[in-house]
Amino acid sequence: PEERGVLPLDTFNVPRGLARAMKKHDYVVTIDTAFEGVIRACGTLTKERKETWINEQLVQLYTALFHAGHAHSIEVWSTKNELVGGLYGVSLGGAFFGESMFSRAPDASKIALVHLVEVLRGAGYILLDTQYVNEHLKQFGVEAWSKRRYMTKLEKALSASPNPSTRFSTASVRSGVASSSSVKRI
């Protein structure tokens, strides 16, 4: 495509309302503990989502990437231990390609995104590719990058080596409160 959605990690914006909401919600955020559950939830049809590109073959392929260490998920859980939000994507070098996200509770997918950015920042990632720009993502600072600008950054990101000790640790955190150095309070 001529333009690509990118969330610049150094200028990531947490909307004020979300920052307040994160202090109120009592969600637990985990990393890489329910990958298949997240991808299946992202592919579930709802009133708002009448069709999906996530079919069984893609679930199996992305799950294989997960087991190989190339795909990751951020999960958001309710106090009743229900998966209420999350996202998943593919990690190559210092680039993370966000594939899809879902929310079954207020702010759950947004909280997952905030934690993803903190993990990526802490590990030294260079690029967070969101594929496209929409109103939901704009509030966080997602920008439409030209193909040339994107390819230049992608080349650098693919040759980068993020810090393996902070890459997608299986930290468990309360919404907005960290229990791991790779995920910080926002």
Task: Tell what function each PLM region has.
Residues P1-I186:
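N-acyltransferase acceptor-side catalytic subdomain
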